[in-house]
Amino acid sequence: MAVIEKRPDFKVVIVGGSISGLVLAHSLHQAGIDYIVLEGRNRIDPQIGASIGLFSNGSRILDQLGVYKSILDLTEPLVWYDMLTGQGDLVRRDDSLRLIEARTGYPVAFLERRQVLQVLHKHTPDQSKILTGKKVVSVRTLADGVEVQCKDGSKFTGDIVAGADGVYSRIRREMWRQAKSDGGLKHLEDDVKAMSADYRCLYGMSYPVPGLRKKSLYRTFNKDWSFLVVVGKDECCFWFVFEKLNGTHKLSNMPTYTESDQAEFVKPFMKRYVSQGVAFEALWHRKTAATLAALEEAQYNHWTYGRFVCLGDSIHKMTPNIGQGGNWAIESAAALTNKLHSLMKTTRQPTTEQISDTLIEYEQSRQVRTKEVCTTAGFATRLEAFEKFWHRPMALYVVPLAGDMLVDVHCQSVAEAPKLDFLPPPELSLKQDTIFQAVQFDQQGPHLVSRVLRATPLLALCFAAFHCLEPTGSAVPANADTEAVRLAMLSYLGDFFPIQVIAMVESARRGNSMGIAGLWPLFGLTGYWGSTGYAVPVYFFLQYILSPPSRYAASDNRLVPTHYARSAVAATGVGYLLLVAYGVLSQQNYLAGYAYWYLLPACTAVVHPLFASFLTHTTFADRVQNPRADMKYLLLSYAISGVFSGITHVYTWAPSPWGLGNILLIAARLRQGALLLEEMGPEKLIQRHHILMLGGGLFWALLHLWDLKSTGRLKAGWFKVLGALGGMLVMFGPGTALVLGWAWREVVLARKTGPH
């Protein structure tokens, strides 16, 4: 790995040989920035029973630094995730941890914290720059730098001092002292009072325990306490026992514990279950190390002042329930190095003001993201301990039914994580189908505001339809049973078939779960009471603005469960047949029967799951092993619906509404109020509905293709796109053109984007 030329005229004094401190040292080395690490303990890797969970946001940076493989050799990737009640009853078991690896390229892994420290220390290019037994007692600001004094009397100078010295950071306190002396930070007292603890935790490690599966993570939820157990390499068990304290403790009365306190603490937990058949006592009797400590929480406003800067637990302390504390420390080390590297490109001898501005940029780049994760971690701790009355039903019933939603949230967060910008991204992060690979495209796409503005014509169609079309169920004349009306209805229903198939596919797509796509039947029912001319364009508008390509950055989120993909056309066909049969039996005229077709989305919403239930459900395996398993079924569904629409279009060519005269007539009449049934004729009314709905559909498809063009994923030029869709529109009608555009989108979204 190439190292940037050294600049010995700028030096960082890193206080703390923690994970954040050593990662910062490695990062600065790669950036060509001089440093020295001062660790207060006599060894870099003390054994205190602490473990660390590595997720992709931290692993990717370690990979850039060339140390990840050595760390990975000490772990065994996790696969299984069990959620249990305090009585040991299984709430949910899934392989979400394997799905995270499939999406990110990096496995979720646990190992001893000291093992990570050992690897980082071993791979340090110049170990003479890592000094132990150097407990810092004060920092003095000089005219052109800082002077750090240690307890043994030694002093070290540099341009800045970085506090990576943990939750009770000396550097943070020295920064506060300096700021208070200068009167330089607003609301400093808020930071001084920020730390608190509502929970305590006994954490440790144990030898293998019979009954605990390899590659598994167990969570047990109960009122006021919870367990977290992870089975790592060689079946070594890492465990946490969380318990709510009696009230909130601030820094002044933060509890501390001795080894004798542990024995008293564990008594009520010994018979409580950590898995379906294993009680905590099995872990306790096989423990190799354990520590009891308060779970401090703190989100500080000020991360830097002058030549001081903090990172890791010294400035963002979260509870360990989501396993992101160490990863966030690694992120902050990378983010700080990025800013310093950018500064070094402009000057090798920056002024105090330039240094201060750079460190403030680092602070601002991290605060929003860090506040979110600290809040999430604290919420997880409280949720698992049922702190609020609604936490129990949410943890035991809502979360288990949410499917892979938690994986979605996690992956969205890590996809936005910083890396070392001056080093190439590691190959593992850019392999086929990872979110890091896909996000390179999708970050270039349009933001929400521009998406709303781009989709505004769909709302204009809705407005036009609402004011210029009357519901088809009103004032049905006696002459509605004519050949012209029949052909107009047939043309309309032929083109509606692809829309219905597409809507059913989108409602079943994994990335659209709990989204607007699932409400398609409601938009159909709205049309029953009014007009699809204004109901469907609203659906198009909402679906577009809420479904950017990034929603499907994970390839399994593009996936449509195969049992739904295989049955979409059949369900739509049966829905058509049921409504045809109803119209025949009720002996309605064509126009009155037309109103019943607004029931089609609701009808197929019932038929589709019924049909799918008779087919093999392979989603659990497909989402990890074969996220393109649905493609042949989707393309077949699109082809069948396109052919059906094209045949009806050709058959009804003479009364087709897509002539220039009809379209110009609508434009002219929009200024004249409602297009009343009595004055235009029933077949014309159907045709106007047809134009507004299918015109919106074609524009909707073009918007999605526009997204793919703007992100660089669709390579075809606009001449080719518009030529293909326009040619299909002329020859086989709008329904066929629409489904062609949608199939094109499907192929692009499913295309392998990583190196292969």
UniProtKB/Swiss-Prot annotation:
Glycans are attached at residues 57, 246. The active site is at 200. One of its GO terms (biological process) is terpenoid biosynthetic process. Pathway: Secondary metabolite biosynthesis; terpenoid biosynthesis. Keywords: FAD, Flavoprotein, Glycoprotein, Membrane, Monooxygenase, Oxidoreductase, Transmembrane, Transmembrane helix. It is a multi-pass membrane protein. The keyword Transmembrane helix applies. Its cofactor is FAD. One of its GO terms (molecular function) is FAD binding. Its EC number is 1.-.-.-. It is found in: Membrane. InterPro entries: FAD-bd, FAD/NAD-bd_sf, FAD_mOase_fung. The chain crosses the membrane at residues 13-33, 522-542, 567-587, 595-615, 634-654, 691-711, 721-741. GO terms for cellular component: membrane. It holds the Pfam family FAD_binding_3. FAD binds at residues 39, 53, 113, 313, 326. The keyword Transmembrane applies. FAD-dependent monooxygenase; part of the gene cluster that mediates the biosynthesis of the meroterpenoids arthripenoids. The pathway begins with the HR-PKS atnH that catalyzes two chain-extension steps to form a reduced triketide, which then primes the SAT domain in the NR-PKS atnG to initiate three more cycles of extension to give a linear hexaketide corresponding to the polyketide part of arthripenoids. Belongs to the paxM FAD-dependent monooxygenase family. This is FAD-dependent monooxygenase atnK. It comes from Arthrinium sp. The gene is atnK.
